[in-house]
């Protein structure tokens, strides 16, 4: 009976990253999105990769509840200087806005490490953190590597790995990420 009547308590992909600081947030997201899906009955739904954890949670919900919907992740849209576009960017003063580009630069440096053969997550995360910490206005919430589908922590870059960061600039918390693919 438990296979037919799935209880949607959303553990797993909600337990890491943003879910640590925002307990219950993804339960609310699932409630709103599932109601929308029931009303609209789409064949496809598009979600941004910038909110990669939310994308994974929605994919899991669709699978668990047997919605016949294809969930498609859309690439991160960026400002000219690399900062991920977000409504939160408007809360940054000009100094914080300039400083916030360190997230993209640090993640890109981590991506290059992986492209050059590094697979040890602790080395990659440590390097990304050290790059972000060069910016005095940046306060790291997290920099982590997790399985891109399950959002479970990983120790090695193998398969699809989400490398994600959340960083405060003043009171504004920004998120960004990339997916490393290695078989």
Q: Where is each model-derived feature located?
A:
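Short, surface-exposed amphipathic charged segments that create phosphate/polyanion-binding patches used
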Residues: 7-9, 83-92, 155-160
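Active-site glycine-rich loop that binds ribose-phosphate moieties when present
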Residues: 25-35, 57
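Glycine-rich phosphate-binding "P-loop"
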Residues: 7-26
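Phosphate/ribose-recognition catalytic cores of enzymes acting on nucleotide-derived substrates
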Residues: 127-183
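Internal active-site segments that recognize and position negatively charged phosphoryl groups
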Residues: 48
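Short, small-residue-biased leader/transition segments that mark boundaries at the very start
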Residues: 1-5
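Glycine-rich, Lys/Arg-enriched anion-binding loops that position phosphate/diphosphate groups
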Residues: 51-141, 146
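Proline-aspartate-enriched helix->loop->beta-strand connector
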Residues: 37-45
């Amino acid at each position: 009976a438990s296979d037919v009547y799935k209880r949607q308590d959303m553990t797993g992909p909600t337990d890491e990253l943003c879910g640590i600081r925002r307990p219950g947030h993804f339960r609310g997201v699932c409630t709103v999105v599932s109601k929308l899906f029931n009303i609209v009955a789409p064949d496809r739904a598009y979600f941004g990769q910038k909110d990669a954890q939310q994308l994974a949670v929605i994919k899991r919900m669709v699978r668990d509840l047997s919605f016949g919907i294809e969930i498609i992740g859309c690439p991160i849209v960026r400002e000219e200087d690399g900062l991920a576009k977000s409504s939160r960017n408007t809360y940054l003063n000009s100094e914080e806005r300039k400083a916030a580009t360190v997230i993209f630069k640090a993640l890109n440096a981590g991506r290059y490490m992986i492209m050059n053969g590094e697979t040890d997550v602790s080395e990659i995360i440590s390097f990304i953190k050290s790059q972000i910490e060069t910016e005095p206005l940046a306060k790291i919430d997290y920099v982590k590597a997790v399985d891109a589908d399950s959002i479970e922590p990983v120790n090695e870059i193998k398969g699809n790995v989400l490398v994600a960061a959340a960083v405060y600039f003043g009171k504004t918390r920004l998120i960004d990420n990339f997916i490393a693919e290695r078989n």
